[in-house]
UniProtKB/Swiss-Prot annotation:
PTM remark: Undergoes autoproteolytic activation.
Site description Cleavage, residues in chain: R216, I217
Source organism phylogeny: Eukaryota, Metazoa, Chordata, Craniata, Vertebrata
Record-annotated active site: H257 (charge relay system), D304 (charge relay system), S400 (charge relay system)
Name of the protein this chain belongs to: Transmembrane protease serine 3
EC top class, as a word: hydrolase
Organism annotation: Mus musculus (Mouse)
Length: 453
C-alpha cells in the first residue's frame, strides 16, 4: 500500500457473518417458512449448527476461565505494567520479574504517624529495628524513596508505634561492611523483636513548615506571600491553567487531567513564590518532563495524578518551600479541618482569581460522599472529599491540581490534589481530591527511577 493509499478497514465482526447469514438475500415480501429453511440449509447444514454453537460456548467459557485465573493475583504481586502475577517473595529480591523491573522498586517506605522506616522483604513489610543502625544508612533509605539527601533518622520506642507496625521486624546485618549496604532490603535479616526496644524513624526532606499565618476558592480568603509556600502556578503557553505542589527542589505534584494531551514540557512553565498572577516579578521555571499516571483515563476520573520535573532545582526560602508527603498508612480522620488554595474562580462560572486564595474545608468520609444525594457511588477509595455539604466553600475552576493540606504534629502534609467537582460550592457537591496516600508508591517509584538515571 502506498503512502497516499487509504488505510484498509477491517470488516466488523458479527455472528451473522460467522454463520453465513449476511449472505442471505431477503426478499421484501415475507417468504414462507419452508423457503427460508431451504435457503439456510443451502448455506449451513442444520446438523452442524448445534456443534458450532456448542464450540463457541466452550471457547467463551475457556477464555473466561483462563482470564479468571490470569487476573486472580490473590496472595501474589501483580505487575502494573502487565497482567503478570509473581510470588510475593519475588518482590524486592534483587531479580527483575516484571517489565521495567517495577518489582524491584518501592522496597522502602516510611509508615504511620511517627514515620517508622519499613522495608519489604520475605513477602512482607517489616519495621526496621534501631539495633546496629548507623546514620549513613538513612541516606541510602532516602535515595530508595527518590530523595537525593536526608534530614535525620531517630529512634522510637516500639510500643509508641501503631499496632500494625509492631508485628514483623528486621535489623541491618552487622556482618556486612558499610560499602556492601547499597539497598536496605538486601541488607537485613528478620527479627521477632528489637533487642534495643526501639525502631528507626526517618525524615528525608525539610518540608511542611512556613512563616505565614495559618487561619479558589469560593468563600475563601486572600493569602499572604509566605502562607502557602509550596503552592505553584502551572502555566501553559503563558496562561495559568492549574495549581500544583512542590515536594522536592525538582518535583511538582499536580492532577493528570491538567496535563493529559498537553504533555509537551516546552509548552509549560512553573511560577513559585507568588500571590498575584498580575505583574509578577518572579521568574518562570522551565519544565524538563511530565509524567502522568499510566492508568488515568479522562472519562473515568480515577488515577488523577501527575508529576512535573523542573529543568533546574528550586532555591528554597521563606516564600518557596516543599510540602511534606504523608506517610504510608497515615490516616487523616473524617471531620479534620484542612486547607485548599489556588487561583481558581471565586464563583461558579467566574474568571480565575488574580490573587491566591485559601479556605478551610473539613474532610468528609467516602461513605457520606458516595450517598445518592451527593456523588452517588462514584467516589473510589483513591479519592477523598472535603468541603461543606451545605455549600458555600469549595475549590473551583483553575484550582485543579492544587494542594489540599492538613497539619499533623506541626508539619503540613499534602493530603489531596484538587481533582473535580460538580459546579463550585454547590449544596451536596463538595470538592473531590486525589488521595495522595493511595499514590505514594507511584510517586516514590518515579522519583527513585529518575534519581538512578
Amino acid at each position: 500500500m502506498g503512502e497516499n493509499d487509504p488505510p484498509a478497514a477491517e470488516a466488523p465482526f458479527s455472528f451473522r457473518s460467522l454463520f453465513g447469514l449476511d449472505d442471505l438475500k431477503i426478499s421484501p415480501v415475507a417468504p414462507d417458512g419452508d423457503a427460508v429453511a431451504a435457503q439456510i440449509l443451502s448455506l449451513l447444514p442444520l446438523k452442524f449448527f448445534p456443534i458450532i454453537v456448542i464450540g463457541i460456548i466452550a471457547l467463551i467459557l475457556a477464555l473466561a476461565i483462563g482470564l479468571g485465573i490470569h487476573f486472580d493475583c490473590s496472595g501474589k504481586y501483580r505487575c502494573h505494567s502487565s497482567f503478570k502475577c509473581i510470588e510475593l517473595t519475588a518482590r524486592c529480591d534483587g531479580v527483575s520479574d516484571c517489565k521495567n523491573a517495577e518489582d524491584e522498586y518501592r522496597c522502602v517506605r516510611v509508615s504511620g504517624q511517627r514515620a517508622a522506616l519499613q522495608v519489604f522483604t520475605a513477602a512482607a513489610w517489616r519495621t526496621m529495628c534501631s539495633d546496629d543502625w548507623k546514620s549513613h544508612y538513612a541516606k541510602i533509605a532516602c535515595a530508595q524513596l527518590g530523595f537525593p539527601s536526608y534530614v535525620s533518622s531517630d529512634h522510637l520506642r516500639v510500643d509508641a508505634l501503631e499496632e500494625q507496625f509492631q508485628g514483623d521486624f528486621v535489623s541491618i546485618n552487622h556482618l556486612l561492611s558499610d560499602d556492601k549496604v547499597t539497598a536496605l532490603h538486601h541488607s537485613v535479616y528478620m527479627r521477632e523483636g528489637c533487642t534495643s526496644g526501639h525502631v528507626v524513624t526517618l525524615k528525608c526532606s525539610a518540608c511542611g513548615t512556613r512563616t505565614g499565618y495559618s487561619p479558589r476558592i469560593v468563600g475563601g480568603n486572600m493569602s499572604s506571600l509566605t502562607q502557602w509556600p509550596w503552592q505553584v502556578s502551572l502555566q501553559f503557553q503563558g496562561y495559568h491553567l492549574c495549581g500544583g505542589s512542590i515536594i522536592t527542589p525538582l518535583w511538582i505534584v499536580t492532577a493528570a487531567h491538567c496535563v493529559y494531551d498537553l504533555y509537551h514540557p516546552k509548552s509549560w512553565t512553573v511560577q513559585v513564590g507568588l500571590v498575584s498572577l498580575m505583574d509578577s516579578p518572579v521568574p518562570s521555571h522551565l519544565v524538563e518532563k511530565i509524567i502522568y499516571h499510566s492508568k488515568y483515563k479522562p472519562k473515568r476520573l480515577g488515577n488523577d495524578i501527575a508529576l512535573m520535573k523542573l529543568s533546574e532545582p528550586l532555591t528554597f526560602d521563606e516564600t518557596i518551600q516543599p510540602i511534606c508527603l504523608p506517610n504510608s498508612e497515615e490516616n487523616f480522620p473524617d471531620g479534620k479541618l484542612c486547607w485548599t488554595s489556588g487561583w481558581g474562580a471565586t464563583e461558579d462560572g467566574g474568571d480565575a482569581s488574580p490573587v491566591l486564595n485559601h479556605a478551610a474545608v473539613p474532610l468528609i468520609s467516602n461513605k457520606i460522599c458516595n450517598h445518592r444525594d451527593v456523588y452517588g457511588g462514584i467516589i473510589s477509595p483513591s479519592m477523598l472529599c472535603a468541603g461543606y455539604l451545605k455549600g458555600g466553600v469549595d475549590s473551583c475552576q483553575g484550582d485543579s491540581g492544587g494542594p489540599l493540606v492538613c497539619q499533623e504534629r506541626r508539619l503540613w502534609k499534602l493530603v489531596g490534589a484538587t481533582s473535580f467537582g460538580i459546579g463550585c460550592a454547590e449544596v451536596n457537591k463538595p470538592g473531590v481530591y486525589t488521595r495522595i496516600t493511595s499514590f505514594l508508591d507511584w510517586i516514590h517509584e518515579q522519583l527513585e527511577r529518575d534519581l538512578k538515571t
